[in-house]
Structure formats: structure tokens, C-alpha cells
């Protein structure tokens, strides 16, 4: 039962909050070492797509959580491990009695465990949305600390702008010069074990990410990204051969650059224009109705 204080806040608020949980794209991912606790040290160039999940937050007499979207059924039945609920509970514990009950609806448009930060983006969107709904005034540092407790990717998803991420993902540096890219996200909808990908790494002390651009134009960025790597892609391709196939399909349909994001299995192809990206996504979807293809544009560094 709600306390009288919670009831008053619930009755006084009739608004709802909507947050977008943007797909996180690893344009480059270099594994540079491993800590004694087992966590791998990474250098990453990260951006975010216009496409993603969507979360609605509405005051409610009791807590509730509902799902929809193409991939909502995958999460159904596993709500106990859902990062959205973990984020809600963690933020509520930090805020205290002002955190009245809320109904959360998640429209799950991103594939599960696919290397584009869907769960982390959902958790970050929950922190942002409930902070607004509950009228909380947490310092940015405190909110970032809560995000890190939920996972190494959540702090960068909290910002959802182009970043260089180092350490285990918690050391963030904005990249305001990064342009927007027309892109197709592609996934064969086959799971990849992240621990197994890391276990199969041939080398865990690789050269750090270097992005020295004299003229940061789009073509220069493309060249710099092409010269970088995703060190997780070779072992992921060993586990899921479809990753190589889907990358080749993107190239065959005009992608200027292709790469796997995160630990997979999502790959991205960068295209010259959004029209070209949309045409490619439509053709790829017709070729493989059982796979995931999504044309999108990434955010620019000046978001």
C-alpha cells in the first residue's frame, strides 16, 4: 500500500514521460588489456542511432511493467532479470519516499543481447525517465554512479551521444566532431556468448584506439574508422558464421564500411545517403525475412 506521502505525489501528478533508448553502435572496439578482477580494458568509439526501444513512464497506484514490440516476447517471463526493473529499484532506493509507484511500458524494437546495448539503453532511459517523473534532483555524478552499478555500458547510454569510452567503459570523453552517418543495422538473430567471445581472443593487449584527424570531415572519419578495429569480431565470426555472411550482404548492397558492433551479432553498414540505406535495408529484408535489418541515422556529436 502507498504511504500518504506517495499517494499525494501520485494524485498530484497526471503526466507521463517518454524516453527513447537509442541503439549503441561501437564504431571501433579495441581490447587493450585485462584487470586482475577479469574485466577487460577497452578503447571504444561509440555513437547512437535514431532507432531504438521506447519507454513510457506513468504514475500508477502500484508498480507495473508491460512489454510490446517485435522483441518484447523474448523478455516476457524474465522480468526478474530485466535491467529496466533493476534501474527502477536502484533509483528508488537512492531517491526515497518521493519515488511513487509507476507503470513502465517497454516497446522492445532492438534484438536481445545483440551487441548494440539494448538492455543497457533501456536501463539508462529508465534512469532518465524516472528522474524526470519523480522530480528528483540527483547530481550528474550520482546518476552516473548508479548507471555503472547496472553495467559497464549504462553510463555511456545515459549520455547517448558520440563518445570515446575507455577503461571498462566508464571513462567517457565526448566527440563533438563526429558526424551523423546513414546506416543499416543487420543481425541474423543468432545469439553470441560474450564471455566465449572474450575467451577466444587471441590477444588481450592490443594497440589503443588512435583517432588523429587533421580535417574532421565525414570522409576523414570514415577513413579513421576503417583503420580502426573491432577486436571481438574475429572470435565472434568463429562462433557465428552468419556474421561474415551478413557483413558481405551489406557490402554487396553498397555499404561504404561494415563492421560488427560490440560482441555481436549485430553488424552495421555505413551508406552514402539515407536513401541508399533505406533501399539496402528493404532489399536485404526481402532476401532474408527471418533476419533483422533496420535503416537508421546516427546522432551527430553536436547533439
UniProtKB/Swiss-Prot annotation:
Keywords: ATP-binding, Isoprene biosynthesis, Kinase, Nucleotide-binding, Transferase. The active site is at 24, 153. HAMAP family: IspE. Catalyzes the phosphorylation of the position 2 hydroxy group of 4-diphosphocytidyl-2C-methyl-D-erythritol. Pfam families: GHMP_kinases_C, GHMP_kinases_N. Its EC number is 2.7.1.148. Belongs to the GHMP kinase family. IspE subfamily. Gene3D superfamilies: 3.30.230.10, GHMP kinase, C-terminal domain (3.30.70.890). GO terms for biological process: isopentenyl diphosphate biosynthetic process, methylerythritol 4-phosphate pathway; terpenoid biosynthetic process. The gene is ispE. It catalyses: 4-CDP-2-C-methyl-D-erythritol + ATP = 4-CDP-2-C-methyl-D-erythritol 2-phosphate + ADP + H(+). This is 4-diphosphocytidyl-2-C-methyl-D-erythritol kinase. One of its GO terms (molecular function) is ATP binding. It comes from Rhizobium johnstonii (strain DSM 114642 / LMG 32736 / 3841). Pathway: Isoprenoid biosynthesis; isopentenyl diphosphate biosynthesis via DXP pathway; isopentenyl diphosphate from 1-deoxy-D-xylulose 5-phosphate: step 3/6. ATP binds at residues 111-121.
